[in-house]
């Protein structure tokens, strides 16, 4: 039996939630919400691995490959986010500029199609970027004029590669990218079984 590229079986595979490191072993992962090192000050996740949709990981692989040639790498700060975490975030910071209101609809993170990233060198050292992660100020906005030239250049490297490979850059957070393919919300129990 032959399956046409883009047919229903192909689409099903692209929708699977997978562990990112199984496909991109050299990518760095530091899930901020799996520790207390985040804007809440609390550990939110019960897992430390980054999960994304298979189709999203395929796009991220191309970005990582291009960075690898430059002696650089992506570092993931957040990927799949359980819907329950979205409610916790909203309770702490009920501002839809920064946090998707779970009553109105879940973040693309809860669909496995969004990733928060930064740039590191081959040793894993973070390069200068515009702000710290989860900086809820105007300095994190993509067109903020006060970034240092080096931070702006590093951010542009990531943004150009991400956009060229099928992601949309969120204007309010320089680190946040959403896959152009749309997915349904994934319940935590479906991921961590």
Task: Name what the model sees in each region.
Residues 5-79, 89-172, 178-193:
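Extracytoplasmic cell-surface/polysaccharide-interacting catalytic and binding patches
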């Amino acid at each position: 039996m032959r399956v046409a590229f883009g047919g229903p079986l192909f689409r099903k595979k692209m929708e699977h939630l997978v562990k990112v490191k199984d496909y991109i072993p050299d990518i760095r992962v530091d899930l901020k919400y799996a520790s207390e090192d985040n804007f809440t000050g609390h550990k939110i996740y019960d897992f430390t691995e980054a999960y994304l949709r298979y189709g999203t990981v395929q796009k991220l692989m191309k970005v990582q490959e291009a960075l690898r040639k430059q002696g650089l790498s992506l570092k993931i700060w957040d990927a799949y986010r359980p819907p329950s975490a979205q409610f916790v975030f909203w309770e702490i910071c009920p501002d839809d500029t920064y946090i998707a209101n779970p009553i109105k609809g879940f973040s693309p993170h809860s669909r496995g199609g969004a990733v928060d990233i930064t740039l590191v060198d081959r040793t894993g050292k973070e390069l200068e970027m515009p702000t710290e992660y989860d900086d809820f100020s105007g300095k994190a906005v993509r067109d903020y004029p006060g970034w240092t030239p080096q931070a702006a250049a590093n951010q542009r490297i990531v943004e150009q590669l991400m956009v060229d490979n099928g992601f949309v850059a969120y204007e309010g957070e320089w680190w946040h990218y959403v896959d152009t393919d749309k997915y349904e919300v994934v319940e935590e129990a479906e991921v961590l079984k």
